[in-house]
Amino acid sequence: MSIDFVVHDADDAVGVVVVEGVEAGQMLTGWVMDQDRTLQFEVKDAIPIGHKLAIRDLAEDETVIKYSVDIGRVVQSIRQGEHVHVHNVKTKRW
């Protein structure tokens, strides 16, 4: 089984895509590192390597956690498998 995305901590809200060519509709396999387990779901968007995807549904105003760190807040609801980027997450710094 090949790994398509990595999640560092089970409490994270996002994973990081580690392969090229991810297209909408693909079934992806992710590795949750701290629990050494995998999860699978269908990706909703094309997502470039190195970018984030939601590993669960995220509601507007929810905090996004990556690597156990608060990286911002959701400004538009995000479904599991969607691209998480500047169009739907904003920093809390300003």
UniProtKB/Swiss-Prot annotation:
The keyword rRNA-binding does not apply. Transmembrane segments: none annotated. Keywords: Cytoplasm, Lyase. It is found in: Cytoplasm. Residues 16-90 form the AFP-like domain. One of its GO terms (cellular component) is cytoplasm. GO terms for molecular function: sulfolactate sulfo-lyase activity. The keyword Lyase applies. Its main location: cytoplasm. Its EC number is 4.4.1.24. Disulfide bonds: none annotated. It catalyses: (2R)-3-sulfolactate = sulfite + pyruvate + H(+). (2R)-sulfolactate sulfo-lyase is composed of a SuyA and a SuyB subunit. Together with SuyB, desulfonates sulfolactate to pyruvate and sulfite. This is (2R)-sulfolactate sulfo-lyase subunit alpha. It comes from Chromohalobacter salexigens (strain ATCC BAA-138 / DSM 3043 / CIP 106854 / NCIMB 13768 / 1H11).
